[in-house]
């Protein structure tokens, strides 16, 4: 997994589901102390740990598996080619499963040309609804109404703004319109421990709105958050938008996604195509269609190198 919080959530889920079975589950990330990590690594090497969940920390030279049989890479779109190959080299011929809601163009192209198997899970969990997706220009009234509605049903809101300098200004704007709204700010330049505390506090419903950068996009599971507002949506890639939208709608409540962008007429052709695609493909299980659009817009990249998107200019290939 790409993030510490996501790794910890997976650890808790696995531990709960495998409770009572003779399978030890552990996790490795920067959140663990040196002593804890050392103990886990020792037990892993001796074969006492059946399932190890972790971030890029698993790539450390001190990580030794007794007999690695299966490698699962979650949120595959967040890893570069070299990192994924390094993961595969943990053991020769290890079975590998990569999972993502939106495969990056290079990975999707590998599957379409038959170099990798592709399985599509198009059936959502029971009692889930499509996320209502709307494109608006930046409007304080739209933002206020969206937050008020979510708070009226005791829900929570993600507000994504990728410019850290603007976050305090947006927080002041929300508190001016909704005085009783509890707003937290989170971004990647904060101390890891401070950021993780804010996210865990948000999970525990200590805040109504989490005003953050794209750090929230990687798989964090907060069923009580069912509205997401994405500012300057035209600046994000198609898979980024789909991943962020996927932070909501994880319960039996109707979820909403508001994409705030300048008028479509002022955007580039690619920017318009991205926003139109994310608005049109809002049904459950539509990630594969969005990935196909992304492949069409960005190109398949370099199948023999490290570029994971882009168009081949002078080199053809035959399948």
Protein language model features and the residues they cover:
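Conserved helix-turn-beta segment of the N-terminal RecA-like "Helicase ATP-binding" lobe
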Residues: 6-43, 177-178
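Post-DEXD/H (motif II) to motif III coupling segment of the RecA-like Helicase ATP-binding lobe
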Residues: 7-11, 65-156
């Amino acid at each position: 997994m790409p993030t510490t919080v996501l790794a910890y959530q997976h650890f808790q889920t696995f531990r709960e589901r495998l409770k009572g079975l003779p399978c030890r589950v552990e996790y490795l990330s920067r959140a663990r102390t040196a002593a804890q990590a050392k103990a886990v690594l020792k037990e892993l090497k001796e074969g006492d740990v059946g399932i190890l969940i972790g971030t890029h920390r698993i790539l450390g030279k001190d990580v030794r598996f007794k007999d690695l049989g299966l490698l699962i890479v979650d949120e595959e779109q967040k890893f570069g080619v070299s990192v994924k190959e390094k993961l595969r080299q943990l053991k020769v011929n290890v079975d590998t499963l990569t999972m993502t809601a939106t495969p990056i163009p290079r990975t999707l192209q590998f599957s379409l040309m038959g170099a990798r198997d592709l399985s599509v899970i198009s059936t959502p969990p029971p009692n889930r609804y499509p996320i209502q997706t709307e494109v608006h220009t930046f409007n304080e009234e739209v933002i206020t109404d969206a937050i008020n509605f979510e708070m009226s049903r005791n829900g929570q809101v993600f507000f994504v703004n990728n410019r850290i300098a603007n976050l305090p200004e947006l927080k002041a704007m929300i508190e001016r319109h909704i005085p009783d709204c509890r707003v937290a700010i989170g971004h990647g330049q904060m101390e890891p421990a401070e950021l993780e505390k804010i996210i865990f506090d948000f999970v525990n419903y200590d805040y109504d709105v989490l005003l953050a950068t794209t750090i929230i996009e990687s798989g964090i599971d907060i069923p009580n958050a069912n509205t997401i507002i994405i500012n300057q949506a035209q600046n994000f890639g198609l898979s980024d938008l789909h991943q962020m939208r996927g932070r909501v709608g994880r319960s039996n409540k109707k979820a909403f996604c508001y994409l705030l962008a300048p008028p479509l007429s002022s955007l580039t052709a690619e920017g318009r195509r991205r926003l139109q695609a994310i608005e049109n493909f809002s049904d459950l299980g539509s990630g594969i269609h969005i990935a196909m659009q992304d492949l069409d817009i960005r190109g398949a990249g370099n199948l023999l190198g490290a570029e994971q998107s882009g168009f081949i200019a002078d080199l053809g290939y035959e399948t």
